[in-house]
Amino acid sequence: MSARLISNSIPNLLNGVSQQPDTVKLPNQSTLQENGLSDIITGLGKRPPTEHIAKLNTDTLTNSKVHIINRDSNEQYVVLVNNQSVKVYDLAGNNKTVVTPDGLTYLTSTNPQEDFNLVTVADYTFIVNKTKTVAKSGTLSTARPDEAIFYVKNGQYRTTYEITIDGSSVASFQTLDNSNASNASSITTDNIATELTNDLNSNLSGYTIVRDGSIIYVKKNSGTFTAEVSDGLGGDGLILVKDKTNSFADLPYKGYTGFVVEIVGDGGTEFDNYFVQWDGTAWVETVKDGLDNSFDTSTMPHLLIRTADGNFRFCKADGSSYTVSGTSYTEPEFASRTVGDETTSPDPTFVTRKINDIFFYRNRLGFLSDENVIFSKAGKFFTFWATTVTTAVDDDMIDLAVSHNKVSILKYAVPFNEQLVLFSDQSQFTLDAEEVLSAKTVSINQTTEYEIDDGVKPIGLGQNIYFGISRGSFAGVREYYVNADTEIKDALDTTVNLPRYISGDLNGLKGSSSENTLFAFASGERSSLFVYKYYFDAGSKALQRSWSKYKFVDTDILLDGDCIQNYLYMVIKRADGTYLEKLNLKTNEVDTGLSFPVL
């Protein structure tokens, strides 16, 4: 039988590569597309060239972490982070000075590309090393001495006021009766306190005793003591305040500067207890003494600070001071616990654990650690403690865990569609909140169950999030979306028809929502850039899904890049060093002085 000649027209070649059999693939798909650009306006053409910007350095490292700082339209920088090294360049390729007073040991890594995550907020770029375990400072706050306050609250005629220390009566005073008007001075609270103080000074040694009006402060200089009072007035005449009291109303009108007492509240639980301290003018909420209330800043995320002179400073966030052009500045500092104790204001859950991701959401800095999401206090990116334990405050820090029937270690967080999408190895969750993000309004719900490649951070582009998946020695990309009609969340495999196309593991996902383009950097073919072009109509129907690749010189290693203002900036390692280049994504733009593009 002779072969039949079949003739048919192909309307376009816009849907890129497919590895399906010819009988199955779409007419506008091909088996190979290299250095071609599938554009829904101009059709299939040649990809734009890269433009050389600068040779950054002579380094030949192949796994640098690349981060682009897009501060504003006038200031953008490329950050290269390596083992105990951080370098910064502007987008013209000029090297910026990076002062490193401390903290470079935090950047110890054998695989910077996977171990480091960065996020930029204004002049601060936070760098987290995912291999570091967060620790406390190891320094306990100074413990208060054993102390007490005796408060003469009421004076009555012919009443005995007595103080007992360690089981022995050490001070006693009986007021006069009311038979004579001159006896009225006997019952003033100041007089009673004076008489009791005189007895205390006479009968006690090794104590510090201070009277202030009707208040008597007693401190044992070494060791502890017990104390009791009696007044013949049912406990309403002479009040003892030592260690703890049942109610804030039980406190005297004044105290001794630095004196701390615990308000125990409901005796059935410790969760409503709190501590107050006399600060010299008022009783203010404070923290229990003798606790480790601070982080070891050498284990916390570090800072790359853009300084006033346009250069940079890499350091711990420990509040150190520095000078630029004669002006003094102070580095930010991670706040310490200032209220409560380990029960009412517990350590954030990232303590003794590793931080897997760092992000910014609704004016809060956020960490992912184990199964928990931890947010800073709103607007206070260095505060991860409650500011009061007496009530729930909307802008306080938030620390909550995902709920699932299997272990779900959270790896990445991506803001999306007014929500925060959380990725674990096998599941996806959404963090939802009402108009105000607070511990009272926030919730986490599981949405989809897809395995991810946890070596590459997902990226949000337009109405979708793209995340990597592993197929053995190849990789793929899923497209997470919300169905506009049903609001059901799902993740479509964009590489289902080319399962053996992206070689190796994904090193990076970057893209431009204005140009409907996703770029994938892969470990198995580091001289190529995998390109996904997509287009959706007004009803969210996909009119284009096109995978292809841009090939570079075989010896080139594409480290990573990012998109800024319709340009893809790429850091490329070559045999003699590291280069910065850019690729124009505006397909319909012509070259200056010409009426047509030069390819």
Language-model region placement:
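Loop/turn residues immediately N-terminal
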Residues: 83-87, 131-133, 215, 364, ...
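Conserved beta-propeller blade signature
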Residues: 77-79, 126, 364-367, 419-421, ...
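Structural signature of eukaryotic scaffold interfaces centered on beta-propeller domains
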Residues: 56-74, 111-121, 347-361, 402-417, ...
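Catalytic or ion-translocation cores adjacent to nucleophile or general acid/base/metal-coordination motifs
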Residues: 436-473
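Elongated alpha-helical scaffolds
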Residues: 113-134, 420-423, 430
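N-terminal beta-propeller domains
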Residues: 1-95, 248-409, 469-489
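Beta-sheet repeat architectures centered on beta-propellers
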Residues: 2-74, 475-599
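Long, charge-dense tracts
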Residues: 106, 115-117, 124, 130, ...
